[in-house]
């Protein structure tokens, strides 16, 4: 949003700082500025001149004009404006000599657009001012552009008077106010106002004027609006925009002769109510839209835009001037619903001060008497409002303020700063201020003492507060064993080449059916974020399955895992949330066994005492490759291969663990085992078994015969093929034996090996040694 430097200076007469340093101060103490635009550069040299003679130039649409520029002398100028004629007073700018249409032109006659006064390119500007003088009421200006996002909490800063108040406070200068409330007429209003819901419209003020003359605005008014990015239209509409830009109070003018009845209604729109706006757009409304209406229907969308049917026109002679206050959220909803944001709606959305409505009318009276001579007020002010209690004073202890600021500050300085910002300040108790918040800061900005700290801090300058590290006690936060355990699990799988995935906690009916789960036992979401995410997941498997199928389209092999919550329904209370790990090992080539063994190895890394026990396959598991993972006799998860019907190509091994059970069964004191002083010995054994025999079953059998000297037994490899018979495989294990007390003799090692061989043969297995 743009602020005119000259306009601000009118409210702060003692302002001597140029626009650039002022912009820096505003950025540091009030709101972020985005830059400065120079306005009306040509006005520096332009002077009022009279056209004396006009001659056509052969073969050209231009004319040669001789002008009297007062002290600048008589000049010959080439001009192409259609309104260039003898006797007209216009703007002459001595920009230098140039040959135009074969004639030397000494300077130029300028249009309003070239001067920056308005957008009129159609002809040279016509003036009524003394010869040789600068353009009256128009001098070069600087528009300071403020970032709108930095003033969303400051409704008062959406007008020049509010910004001028900030400038006056920053520089310690007095502030003037152009709104003269004593201009407001007393007496019976010429129009009535009826508000249906005072919460949606806390205040509605209106005045009626007659003997109105609608005409172009004076140049100073056009220039003032153009400099801040508003388009001049006519004197009545321009006046309402001027008041809005000055006081942050949007206003609207209705042609009184086009209104039906003597009452203005503020009410919700009727369902299907039809409305044609000033922008010629047609809208169909509903009760969520607040409207201004007469006896025939809606004449304006409250706080957003006026209606075409009551617009000010060239023949308007009577005007109803509206100055109202609307609920911020109501205006925002209507603006969003019709996809239209206006200068008025942007201000109302910031929660404007209801007391500002009559100030806007007072300022309008003064302006209208200047720009529409002969205008007359009819009746008094129509003013319907809700009584809004004044906010209670805020207690501000000086010691607390200093502690929050991080620096010392005198009580007199605090009082000076707050009073310069129009806060009322008293000190009923020594060292404790009682601060009264002005109405324009109480709507959504200042409510607690912490807000006052910000006011004082920004005015003394945050750069004046020396940085200091906070003095806080350093203590170790309490640990979260579950989080730490999951962190360790995550690191284990990442270190072994797995990629972590994150899936939604929601499932579709289709994915549930694919695994044969009972959707009736799951929690159904009443407002799903998508049609295929209506069930809370009671298993992480459908999610990882979808990851596998999608990645299998692009990769030969990959490893994925997810740590998340299974959500199970309870009969009463909140759902039961169980942390689970699910890991997938996919390979497009091979028989899938490496994936199963790798996942089994990682399970053993988490649970050294885990056992793999063959289990009956579920419908989504490979019929011959399913096992339970058990620790101390309890099942903590499953290891299996996905059924081929779920994986089009390749094989996918899955590890599914209940992390809560795993953590509880593996928790305990970590015991230190001294490094063995005596060497261990290792030997390999290969067991011949059927293809369906589980390696875990064979390993458990070998361990049962190894006796107390065994230290570890590890799976080495599996072989199928010649010279083995069909249906037979060779499974190799490495057994390590030793003693903490002595080095084992070769006889003891042989005894262990023989015990294993005899025991396995007794079970019907043949060994290759």
Curated annotation (Swiss-Prot):
Residue span, B5 domain: 389-467
Record's protein name: Phenylalanine--tRNA ligase beta subunit
Names of the cofactor(s): Mg(2+)
NCBIfam families: pheT_bact
Molecular function terms from GO: ATP binding; magnesium ion binding; phenylalanine-tRNA ligase activity; tRNA binding
GO cellular component: phenylalanine-tRNA ligase complex
UniProt cross-references to PROSITE patterns, sorted A to Z: B5 (PS51483), FDX_ACB (PS51447), TRBD (PS50886)
Family under the similarity heading: Belongs to the phenylalanyl-tRNA synthetase beta subunit family. Type 1 subfamily.
Keyword Cell inner membrane: no
Reactions it catalyzes: tRNA(Phe) + L-phenylalanine + ATP = L-phenylalanyl-tRNA(Phe) + AMP + diphosphate + H(+)
Source organism superkingdom: Bacteria
Keyword hit for Endoplasmic reticulum: no
GO biological process: phenylalanyl-tRNA aminoacylation
Cofactor note: Binds 2 magnesium ions per tetramer.
Compartments, record wording: Cytoplasm
Gene that this polypeptide is encoded by: pheT
PANTHER family the record matches: PHENYLALANINE--TRNA LIGASE BETA SUBUNIT, PHENYLALANYL-TRNA SYNTHETASE BETA CHAIN AND LEUCINE-RICH REPEAT-CONTAINING PROTEIN 47
Residues that hold Mg(2+) according to the record: 445, 451, 454-455
Taxon lineage: Bacteria, Pseudomonadati, Acidobacteriota, Terriglobia, Bryobacterales
EC number(s) from the headed UniProt entry: 6.1.1.20
InterPro entries on file: aa-tRNA-synth_II/BPL/LPL, B3/B4_tRNA-bd, DNA-bd_dom_put_sf, Fdx_antiC-bd, Fdx_antiC-bd_sf, NA-bd_OB-fold, Phe-tRNA-ligase_IIc_bsu, Phe-tRNA-ligase_IIc_bsu_bact
